[in-house]
């Protein structure tokens, strides 16, 4: 019989649907018909709300009879389906159509309409829906008039939408609601950036439409998707099930933001580091209870989207609440744990026969406005629990070996005598009260010392005084030795500084300066001289025949390495060495090496050897050494396994000392090398040790680089370096990479950020090069100076510099996006997209005056993979989905790129930037339109739900750069 009934419904579905579509039923008749179906077939069920109240709602889900009744309302002319519920719907429609009841129409039913919350999910494109859409689902709250019952009406909820120009409004969704709160679902296209929605609600009773039409306010789709703010406040704290419960309320009228429906409360007490979570779905009560809180504690509450487990994720709302003691929340003290014992004291029994007895006394007093009074407690206490712990005691090693003493004491007693294993030990006694419900009071502690003597006497007996004097003498002697060592180190430092200052004056008198030299190409001509104290010296002031001596390179903390030369120039007035500095100093003491000691060819004598930026080990010499025929470096693989890759002999390179890279899980060393045959600079990457893990990692990177197609914004793979290792010829011992002389993007950001935040990096007296003109007040980085230049031709404003810098960052962002697009299109992920792995191709001396063809390149493919199962991630670079246990995909690279964009927006000062409100170090830079584009892109990349692709970001930044060039 059931199978026959199912086949009957299935056979009648198609013609019935066709009839319903061809015969459109007016809403004025359909609404009251649905109301009668709900009254007839709907089931009333009790639902527990977030406010822990009972709500009576009509439940029509999975209700076949109600569905048939609705079908009868829509198909009032169809006669082939003879089911009672279907016929009831048809008869209800006919009665509404033919009967006009004399019932007064109600003027007001709804006072307001709210979108309580919305959750978003992504619907990918398919054959039926060529464009991707966002599915939004949430809760709607209908505020009824005071004397309107919840079950008196049904509601038609329509979702209206409009574009940015607000010229046309269309209905994108219609849904029926049978209660004052219900769920809605509608779609929003992903390609629309500015999209507003609102609700239109029509009300019906069993006779027709009532109360007019109500509207909610307009909400922008971007504000809905960001969900950055929720107005949350504490409503009350109550006693609940032996614990405290905090009731929070959310105010929708105070903000235009629409929160997510799936939320969680992340909280912890001030005395604990454990994070607790309370997941909930926001309902029409706009409240939530957080239960199982401890009394008399302070809690930090954070509201976040559901599924968030990272402390660094920005919260939608936060609050710090103080839970009062239990007795402040109840009228009956028997509902609380007993108060702690008071007047806890001890005495030793000094009788010769009872030397090991200890007497403990205590009282239990009542509450009175938070203070103890002399009245004994009237609430039922079952017993007292006493614990005595032996303490570590001087001159008695046995004390710490004794077991803890535990006694259960009847409630009627207020003192206890018990034996201890050793009276020469000190003890800590703990006392708690336990009531009939096994609730334990706070612990009261007291320390017990031998024979009631002061604590220090029990630890320092008369026989120990000589030992203590000796110990004090040792401590004083050790302190004196450390003080002498500190004074000696300070003296040596001051002596070195004095020598350096003397050499400065001596060289200044001779017309010598130690400068950073910037060139157009790796072997090109000198275009600018920047001395060590960041002062600029025009090239015209330098002797045309520059005699350069390669100096020991300066290593900055996380900074770039620029080559330093000793340059000679003509001084109009010789500089005298101060009298107090007039002492002998030889050239051997200045710490600089002469370049003639490292000549390997006349054409390369003035070339700049720039080490890789990730250097940690200081080297006393940077002589360029000839490579031997046999290399001590670990072989990666035989060359016949990679014979399709260009190879270069190791003996053809001049190699600097290898230096270790500052990065977790790095398996390689880096050095800058010179190919003496081709006269070009390269970066060489070699294994750092001989372990199988290192060799496997290097071989894995080589496999990746051989399949990666070249790209203009990826650091170019130049081939492999081969050599003999032991008795094995033609072994791959290193990976040759394009040399990038400009250092990392992080160093560039730090350089411009420090200028913006500090305005000046040096004072006038810091530079001996500026002594040609003692009245010069030139600031570091001339482009930021508001003074006129030497010819007073024009004034360069800060606004122009910040415009240029912001556009430069957008250009860099476009180039990195293009590199990521290239990687992702090949099915690969980088996994280390940071500003430390983005390199500037050309060198620069002034970060505000770089070459126009400056580009950035993405490098360090040591952890790049094509299979997401093989990803090895840095703990600090894990996107939210990976923390939740999902696979690392291309969107993880986008999240890391968002951190790079945030670093650009904040000019490297990430400690003062907040996710969602990224701030730069300079107001002018922060308020630029191009900086706003960077900031918006960073927010989109750091979203936990939806992120743009690399191609989308590339298009965004390209449009900004094209507009800047027009």
Swiss-Prot record:
Disruption phenotype: 71 percent of embryos of mutant mothers develop into sterile adults with extra body muscle cells at the restrictive temperature (25 degrees Celsius). Low embryonic lethality (7-8 percent). Loss of lin-5 and grp-1/2 enrichment at the EMS/P2 cell boundaries at the 4-cell embryonic stage. Decrease in phosphotyrosine levels at the site of contact between P2 and EMS cells. Keywords: ATP-binding, Cell cycle, Cell division, Cell membrane, Glycoprotein, Membrane, Mitosis, Nucleotide-binding, Signal, Transmembrane, Transmembrane helix. GO terms for biological process: asymmetric cell division; asymmetric protein localization involved in cell fate determination; cell fate specification; developmental process involved in reproduction; embryonic digestive tract morphogenesis; establishment of mitotic spindle localization; establishment or maintenance of cell polarity; gamete generation. Residues 656-966 form the Protein kinase domain. It comes from the Eukaryota. It is found in: Cell membrane. Residues 492-966 are cytoplasmic. GO terms for cellular component: plasma membrane. It is a single-pass type I membrane protein. Residues 1-19 form the signal peptide. SUPFAM superfamilies: Protein kinase-like (PK-like). One of its GO terms (molecular function) is ATP binding. InterPro entries: Kinase-like_dom_sf, Prot_kinase_dom, Ser-Thr/Tyr_kinase_cat_dom, STK_NEK, Tyr_kinase_cat_dom. SMART domains: TyrKc. Residues 20-470 are extracellular. The chain crosses the membrane at residues 471-491. Glycans are attached at residues 62, 126, 183, 214, 251, 372. Pfam families: PK_Tyr_Ser-Thr. ATP binds at residues 662-670, 685. The protein kinase domain is predicted to be catalytically inactive. Belongs to the protein kinase superfamily. During early embryogenesis, controls asymmetric cell division and the asymmetric localization of P granules of germline precursor P2 and its descendant P3. Probably upstream of tyrosine kinase src-1, plays a role in endoderm development by controlling spindle orientation during EMS blastomere cell division. Controls EMS spindle orientation probably by promoting lin-5 and gpr-1/2 enrichment at, and let-99 exclusion from the junction between P2 and EMS cells. PANTHER family: PROTEIN CBG16200 (PTHR44535), SERINE_THREONINE-PROTEIN KINASE NEK9 (PTHR44535:SF1). This is Protein mes-1. It comes from Caenorhabditis elegans. The gene is mes-1.
